[in-house]
Amino acid sequence: MATNIRKTHPLFKIINNSLIDLPTPTNISIWWNFGSLLGLCLIIQILTGLFLAMHYTADISSAFSSVAHICRDVNYGWLIRNIHANGASLFFICIYLHIARGLYYGSYIYKETWNIGVIILLLLMATAFVGYVLPWGQMSFWGATVITNLLSALPYIGDMLVQWIWGGFSIDNATLTRFFTFHFLLPFIIAALTMVHLLFLHETGSNNPTGLDSNMDKIPFHPYYSYKDLLGFFILLLLLTLLALFMPYSLGDVENFIPANPLVTPPHIKPEWYFLFAYAILRSIPNKLGGVLALAFSILILLLVPMLHTSKQRNLTFRPITQLLFWLLVTNTIILTWVGGQPVEQPFITIGQIASITYFSFFLILFPLAGWWENKMLNL
C-alpha cells in the first residue's frame, strides 16, 4: 500500500500533526477560534506592513509626507494603510478576547503556553507603540515623548536609559529610524514565538469548555475545525473590510492629521484605544515611578494567574461566584478604557483610581478568595 506523503515527509509531517490530523476535543466552542484569527491578523499585518515599508521614509522631514504620498499617489496605498491601521485594532480585539477566554476556561493551567502568550502580548504592545510613532503626526510625537519619558522614573539608570532609547537628548531622527527598525523586526519575532506557543499547546492538547480530560473524545482538526476557522476568517475579513472602507479613521486620533510639532502640545495626549486601560492605571497613581510600575504590572499580573489559582475546578462554567467576578473584571477594564480617554480632571481621576484598585484586587485577592470559598461550599 502506498504511504501518504503528508505522514512521512519530514516537513509535511509537522504541518500534518499541527493542522490536519491533530486530535482536537469535540466540544470546543467559537471562543477557541481566536487563536487562528490572531494568526490571520499577524499575516495581514506583516503583508500590508511590507508594502507600506516599500514607500515609507523613516526621516522626520519626510515621514509625514511619505504617509500622505502612500494614501494619495501609490496604487491602492490608501487601502493598504487603512487595512494596516484598522488591522491593528482588530488584532488587539482578538487578543483581548483570546486572553479573556483563557481566564474564563482556565487555559492558564498550561503554564508554558500561557507564559509565552503573555510575552507575545508584551511584544505586540511594543510593536503597536513604535508603529504609532511612524506617521510622525502630533499624537505620534507627543505619545512617544510621554511614554519613553516614563523610563526616566527608574532610579539611577532612568535618564541614561531614555537618552539611549532616543539616540540623543530629545526625540529626533535617530528615534524615528530605530522605531521603524523595531516595528519591522518585532512582528517576525512574534511569528517565531507563535510557533513556540503552538508547540507547547500541542504538547498538552487543547483545553475545552468543560475543563475535563477529553482524551477519550477527540476528532481530527481537518475538516471539522479547519472549516470552522474558515468561517471565523470570513467574519474577521468582513469586519476589517467594513472598517477600512467605510470608517477608516474612526478608531484613530484627529491630532495625527497634524504634522509633529515639538513647540505645540496637543490639549490631551493619549495612546490608541487598545492601550487606554493601562494608560488609565498609569495616570491614577500620583507618583511617577509608582505609575510606571503599575503600568507594567497591569500586564505582568497575567503571569501570576496560574500561581493564584485556588479552585478545585479548572474553569468558571460551574463557579457562579467567580463567574460574577470575571464579568465585573471585564466591566472594570471597559471603565478603565473609557477613563483613559478622558481629560485628567474630576470625576475621572477618582473613577480611575477606584477602577485601578479593583483591577488589581480581582487578580490578587478576589479570584483566589472566591476559589477557596467555592471549594469550601463543595465540601458541605
Swiss-Prot record:
One of its GO terms (biological process) is mitochondrial electron transport, ubiquinol to cytochrome c. Gene3D superfamilies: Cytochrome Bc1 Complex, Chain C (1.20.810.10). Binds 2 heme b groups non-covalently. Heme b b562 binds at H84, H183. The keyword Transmembrane applies. One of its GO terms (molecular function) is metal ion binding. It is a multi-pass membrane protein. GO terms for cellular component: mitochondrial inner membrane; respiratory chain complex III. Keywords: Electron transport, Heme, Iron, Membrane, Metal-binding, Mitochondrion, Mitochondrion inner membrane, Respiratory chain, Transmembrane, Transmembrane helix, Transport, Ubiquinone. The cytochrome bc1 complex contains 3 respiratory subunits (MT-CYB, CYC1 and UQCRFS1), 2 core proteins (UQCRC1 and UQCRC2) and probably 6 low-molecular weight proteins. This is Cytochrome b. It comes from Urogymnus polylepis. The lineage of its organism: Eukaryota, Metazoa, Chordata, Craniata, Vertebrata.
